[in-house]
Amino acid sequence: MNTLLLVEDEKIIRQGIRIMIERSGVEIKEIIECNNGLSALEILKTRPIDVMFTDIRMPKMDGIQLVDEIQKLDHKPLIAAISGFDEFDYAVNLMRNGVTEYISKPVDREIIKKTLEKFNGVIEERESEQSRRKKVAYQQLQYMLFYDDITKVEIENICLKSE
């Protein structure tokens, strides 16, 4: 995993979650911290983020609004929502809008670890699929470039298969 965005308005809680993330054993190249949803959205607009852990209740822009805004972006991170409110309606609304995990406060280190491991597995699967698609596209391109007797119909069929 390259980047994780941690969005939590309470500094002590944010620091505690960061320590749990760092000690999880899951390799993360960069952890970025924000204290509100608006700052997080600005970061998400400027660079790809693999995973985001976000609080629900925050100033300026809460986690629910942040998750809604993320749906408009091209690159969407895997999202875990963290909340002190154990309300079913919150969880359902967030899950419908792209949140994969809902973590209740107080945050448990094992839940953080399992969530990171799950997200890391999803990221590895995505990267493997992208690599496979690139390899197939490269092979198809080689075929089209090196065979002089290839027909227009064959080229169109190859292009249709790669979509």
PLM region descriptions:
Residues 58:
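Receiver (REC) domain active-site loop signature in two-component systems and cognate sites
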Residues 33-42, 63-66:
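Helix N-cap/capping motif at the beta->alpha junctions
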Residues 11-32:
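Two-component/phosphorelay signaling modules centered on CheY-like receiver
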Residues 45-48, 70-76, 97:
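Conserved phosphotransfer cores of two-component systems
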Residues 107-163:
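Interdomain helical linkers/hinges and coiled-coil/dimerization scaffolds
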Residues 8, 55:
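Active-site residues of response regulator receiver
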